[in-house]
Amino acid sequence: MALTPRIAIDAMGGDVGVRVMLAGAAMARHKHDGLRFILVGDEERIKAALDNHPNLRAASDIIHTDGVVSGEDKPSQALRKAKSTSMGLAIDAVKRGDAGGAVSAGNTGALMAMAKLALRTMPGIDRPALAALLPTLGDNDVVMLDLGANTECDATNLTQFAVMGAAYARTAMGLERPRVALLNIGTEELKGTDEIRDAAALLRGAEGLPMQFAGFIEGDKLSRGDVDVIVHDGFSGNIALKTIEGTARFVTDLLRRAFTSSTRSKIGFLISRPATELLRHHLDPNNHNGAVFLGLNGVVLKSHGSADAKGVANCVHLCAELIEKDITRQVTEDLANFRRGDAA
């Protein structure tokens, strides 16, 4: 039975502001009519923004606070004022069971710290991972994790990330046996750090899990679609993600310059417009907005700080989907099966 998709929205987090966050929530509700919301933040500003979205207003409750986590706040600073901030109260709604999940565009480090403290990690997990779906040249997206929550990881962390990432791929993409690979500097077994090689050995020996270990993958193959899940520490993963995002912006800007450089180029753009619009859609990060913290006893998603309303809507829709498909139960069961197999 599907869980009730009620989502707590940190209306004050990120660079986008209350109006964009609520416009995104309203767009998500148009696609997903059963959605309900808890909007957390400055009540006066929230009510003013809701004037433009009567459909959202009818489906929302408001928790007032004027406390905000800034982008400059360290996790330790954010934790000290968690109970008085929009981010902290949104997560607390998940902890109490009032919401099935939370969405914030705020400070990633603070969000991780607050979510871990409030929701706690699943049995056997000491480090949640930040996972996102990214486009590929294949038929499916690829799950990449960790994207910055943990800068240093040992072999056990990486194997747990692999199990959680595979569960996410099955839940979000409907894959029966996702192909899982470890990001490395080469595909040979002797390449990479001790942690990566040890994680590979553990994954090769894992039995009975609904996943396929595909070995190592190099950075130039991330978007080919050869695998469904790519595992790495948060330091490497964040660099890889920012490189992908930067390359997408570079290609988009390059095309814009090329097609506006002369009259002939502008005519060429009109002829090739359907193809260029398809490319722009594929490269637009708003179409893949939303990273989930895996390994927590609850659903918490991070929206890009500069996402537009469409991007926020996609993040909210993903949150609702993960609540309905009970991603928390799926990850918990897979981790338990992995531990049993590892102990056998």
UniProtKB/Swiss-Prot annotation:
InterPro entries: FA_synthesis, Phospholipid_synth_PlsX-like
Principal location: cytoplasm
Any Pfam family hit: FA_synthesis
NCBIfam families named among the record's database cross-references: plsX
Function: Catalyzes the reversible formation of acyl-phosphate (acyl-PO(4)) from acyl-[acyl-carrier-protein] (acyl-ACP). This enzyme utilizes acyl-ACP as fatty acyl donor, but not acyl-CoA.
Family to which this protein belongs: Belongs to the PlsX family.
Pathway: Lipid metabolism; phospholipid metabolism
GO CC annotations, alphabetized: cytoplasm
GO molecular function per UniProt: phosphate:acyl-[acyl carrier protein] acyltransferase activity
Record text on subunit structure and interactions: Homodimer. Probably interacts with PlsY.
Reaction equation(s) it catalyzes: a fatty acyl-[ACP] + phosphate = an acyl phosphate + holo-[ACP]
Listed PANTHER family: FATTY ACID/PHOSPHOLIPID SYNTHESIS PROTEIN PLSX (PTHR30100), PHOSPHATE ACYLTRANSFERASE (PTHR30100:SF1)
Name of the protein described by the UniProt record: Phosphate acyltransferase
Compartment(s) where it occurs, according to its Swiss-Prot or TrEMBL record: Cytoplasm
Enzyme class at the top of the EC tree: transferase
Signal peptide residue numbers: none
Annotated keywords: Cytoplasm, Lipid biosynthesis, Lipid metabolism, Phospholipid biosynthesis, Phospholipid metabolism, Transferase
Gene Ontology biological-process annotations: fatty acid biosynthetic process; phospholipid biosynthetic process
EC number: 2.3.1.274
Superkingdom to which the source organism belongs: Bacteria
